[in-house]
């Protein structure tokens, strides 16, 4: 369990107020949810805008800030609103020890940002930088984000990149981005490498007993459409079913449109909310209602069903324990088995981004269903036919 301490520490920090107020109750688990390209410096850096971020279900704010004073203000605003900030500024790189010593005890600090999507040649310098930061602060993790698999010529080259990153930079967690939902004309489809990327990252993280962080795309650009609830559910529940311990959205605030035509982020460039803001808020609330299933969970098996299963995945040939029947009638589904604090779970996800799934699932008397509001009901209270909207999940919990 030592490997998930950085994640759990961030999560527990966000519930410290409620724990103090309710000393005799266990804190409600909270999955860390990170807003990439968060609130910018300047006129929008206010308590009200940070509270708006928190109200949408985020726990970590990562603003791209290029002045020390702006980074300190972000720490202050995060502390005031129960958030944590991923800290970045030029001084963190030019004078890491002195800068870290100034901020390491700040209540708004969550992590230190190093770099996005480094190449192999960048890793030795990043390792030296990380060691300098860690020499001054062993409590808050350094953070960087890795490339997706399709940035490499082959899956094996990607695996080598991950392994080289871990051997050299050796951070407490892995993080990578992969934005799978594409649209060409009226056709919406998943990148063929999406599930392969999850397979690789989940496996590499488990082999090293480290958590991994994964993404959902919240901002349209290029061939990536304006996200719907179905699009976000597919990405986020897939991340969680594969064992991700922190969820990240790219982006929260709309970046400049000059290069990538970013548009319809949850918060647009003028500071107004788009319709995506309410979708993100809804999905985050839904995910946190079942956080006790996923936060701290360990993957025990991952399989797919369907006439054709995705690249890099494995076909389900044996039913999970207590599942008597599972028939998806040739459609694709992910079947993830998790264990968390002595309790076993089976997560069944519709892997289509466009089509509902009719799944026939029967269990024995040792299973409960974990409903979207987090409540539990005996699985025997329901019929065997379950209709899952695109990306959605059924969650079964073994009765203790």
Which residues make up each language-model segment?
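Bacterial Sec-dependent N-terminal signal peptides
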Residues: 1-23
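Glycan-processing catalytic domains of CAZymes
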Residues: 22-365, 373-400
């Amino acid at each position: 369990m030592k490997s998930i301490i950085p994640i759990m520490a961030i999560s527990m920090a966000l519930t410290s107020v409620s724990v103090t107020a309710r000393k005799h109750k266990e804190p409600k688990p909270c999955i860390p949810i990170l807003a990439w390209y968060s609130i910018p410096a300047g006129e929008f850096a206010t308590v009200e805008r940070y509270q708006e971020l928190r109200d949408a279900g985020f726990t970590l704010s990562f603003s791209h800030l290029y002045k020390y004073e702006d980074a300190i203000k972000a720490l202050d605003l995060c502390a005031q609103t129960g958030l944590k900030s991923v800290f970045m500024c030029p001084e963190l790189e030019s004078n890491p020890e002195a800068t870290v010593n100034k901020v390491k005890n700040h209540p708004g600090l969550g992590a230190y940002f190093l770099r996005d999507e480094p190449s192999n040649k960048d890793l030795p310098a990043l390792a030296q930088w990380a060691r300098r930061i860690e020499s001054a602060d062993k409590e808050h993790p350094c953070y960087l984000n890795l490339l997706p698999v399709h940035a490499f010529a082959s899956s094996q080259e990607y695996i080598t990149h991950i392994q080289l990153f871990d051997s050299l930079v050796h951070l407490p967690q892995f993080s990578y981005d992969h934005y799978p939902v594409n649209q060409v004309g009226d056709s919406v489809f998943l990148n063929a490498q999406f599930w392969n990327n999850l397979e690789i990252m989940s496996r590499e993280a488990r082999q090293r007993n480290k958590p991994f962080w994964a993404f959902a795309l919240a901002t349209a650009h290029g061939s990536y459409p304006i996200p719907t609830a179905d699009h976000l559910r597919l990405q986020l529940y897939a991340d969680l079913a594969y064992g991700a311990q922190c969820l990240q959205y790219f982006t929260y605030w709309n970046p400049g449109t000059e290069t990538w035509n970013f548009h319809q982020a949850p918060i647009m460039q003028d500071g107004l909310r788009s319709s995506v803001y309410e979708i993100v808020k809804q999905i985050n609330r839904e995910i946190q209602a079942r956080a006790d299933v996923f936060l701290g969970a360990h993957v025990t098996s991952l399989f797919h069903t369907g006439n054709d299963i995705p690249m890099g995945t494995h076909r389900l040939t044996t039913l999970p324990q207590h599942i008597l029947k599972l028939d998806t009638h040739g459609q694709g589904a992910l079947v993830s088995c998790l264990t968390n604090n002595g309790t076993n779970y089976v997560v069944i996800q519709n892997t289509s981004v466009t089509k509902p799934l009719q799944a026939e699932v029967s269990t024995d008397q040792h299973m409960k269903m974990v409903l979207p509001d987090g409540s539990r009901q005996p699985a025997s209270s329901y019929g065997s036919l379950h209709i899952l909207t695109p990306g959605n999940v059924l969650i079964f919990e073994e009765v203790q």
